[in-house]
């Protein structure tokens, strides 16, 4: 079941919302949300409901054991993390790993045909964060299994995030207020997210698919950029739209999830981009991988290695194929570049800000257009289609304007020629 389906909008959501509103007491409300979340998941994946419940039960028990057996807690949390990662490997990466082994060593191991459970990357990361936080003492182990299961399976953030930490919603699971103002804000936010998904992302996606489906040799520079920018904004409005809907649904039921996107295309570096894009995932890797590896406390070389490892894992998390692996490496390389080259760390004026926005968008754009094409060597060579000299101003204006919601009129100030040309390209720049 997806948020934009008629079943969800016209049947599921009204019933769950009304039931949650009229039921007295937090226990009844939680039971309603838990039942609804399991039905929501079972609608598309009835078999894998058992898998999700089993995962929640195992992590619930691990957390209790960590709290009870303090002298053995390091071993317990290690086993918990290994089992959670094994769950991902089996259901998400088994086919990819088998194919890779067969290709590299000429073996003929049968490739397992395992259907990927919806949301497994999200609920597994949430479960791991819960157990690790109990180990660290960030929160106590929850004695009530139903509350842990509700935290892991809560339907608004189950499919596409944001990834929620237990201590961020613990108090709201225990007691929360469903106010008229919160419901109104939630409905507005949900509608905004639904509009992003249906009215913008889907249209951008059709444009990108049509253009990327054409032979690369038949595309001119302008058309190639239209395809790249369309896909760039398709994934943003799709993913941020789902996050908006999840946050809005949370408000409607009295929960407050953290923001997951913060105008990422206004970033002036790849480092800043990842502070604004899929914030819950970036913060998860920061807290549970980057900092334990040493963070930036052991010199630049070690910092770069740590960042590279994190983005290698980020790429693998996004998908089980070589394309996502190289996509993670690609971003990791630019993060290392920004760490070593002083130019990226120095403050600058408006001109440098505009240049850095263009640089960031070029890097991100080239990365996503290659990800759009499932095989890396068939990626559309967008950046190789250098526009004619007379077109530089046009592309500058598109990129500077797409960099964020506010650029202070910089494109108009830099050159009358650039601004005059902008009017001519708005048809494919917006």
List PLM regions with ranges.
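Membrane-embedded transmembrane alpha-helical bundles that form the catalytic cores
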Residues: 1-402, 406-407, 411-430
